[in-house]
Amino acid sequence: MKALLIRDLRLATRAGGGFGLALAFFLIVCTLVPFGVGPEGGTLSRIAPGILWVGALLSCLLSLDRIFALDFEDGSLDLLATAPLPLEGAVAIKALAHWLVTGLPLALSAPVFGLLLHLPGPAYPWLVASLLLGTPALSMLGAFGAAVTVGLRRGGLLLSLLVLPLYVPTLIFGAEAVRRGAAGADPMTALVFLAAITLATLALAPFAAAAALRVNLR
């Protein structure tokens, strides 16, 4: 399992799907928003929680199609399906690698991007906490979508259409936690729901993704 994780981390960085791409896209989103809505600090601070979460969500979406695509092309996916390690475990490892390359760097760098959007000071710890809780669900749901669309031509578009609706609950509670933190209210309720979504996703999505892979490998 450790060897598979290290291999996937190396592949992610070498194949152009590393954290640099996700961070660059996140920066572009946070930079362009003030041009669209105006530079007024009050307006930006009100919409900052939602914009930051949408930016993180879209940044995670960029490299989802690579989770299984390279292994499918070189035949490694067939070997994983017949390896002693259960396919569900391999799916979980690949989702973890995706999160380490995209979700974790986004969560840790989000306060810097929050400055660009005049995010209120009290919201910063809740921004990081919500992203640390929510982005694992994004990676795991993305792994499920990648498993369903692996091997399809132009599967990236279908992957986006499949995964984005599944991201909505995480987006709602993640942005709400940051919004409550910015207003000085208690964000714990939103964080509890966010954690519940992530735990449910981590428990169920590997089995769904493994089943989809077995169907596509027949």
Swiss-Prot record:
Membrane topology note: Multi-pass membrane protein
Domain of life: Bacteria
Chief place where the protein resides: membrane
GO cellular component: plasma membrane
GO molecular function term, any single one: heme transmembrane transporter activity
Keyword flag Secreted: no
Protein location: Cell inner membrane
S-S bridge residues: none
GO terms under biological process: cytochrome c biosynthetic process; cytochrome complex assembly
Database matches in Pfam families: CcmB
Keywords in alphabetical order: Cell inner membrane, Cell membrane, Cytochrome c-type biogenesis, Membrane, Transmembrane, Transmembrane helix, Transport
Record field: transmembrane: 17-37, 50-70, 99-119, 126-146, 155-175, 190-210
Family: Belongs to the CcmB/CycW/HelB family.
Job description of the protein: Required for the export of heme to the periplasm for the biogenesis of c-type cytochromes.
Protein name: Heme exporter protein B
Source species: Paracoccus denitrificans (strain Pd 1222)
Gene behind the chain: ccmB
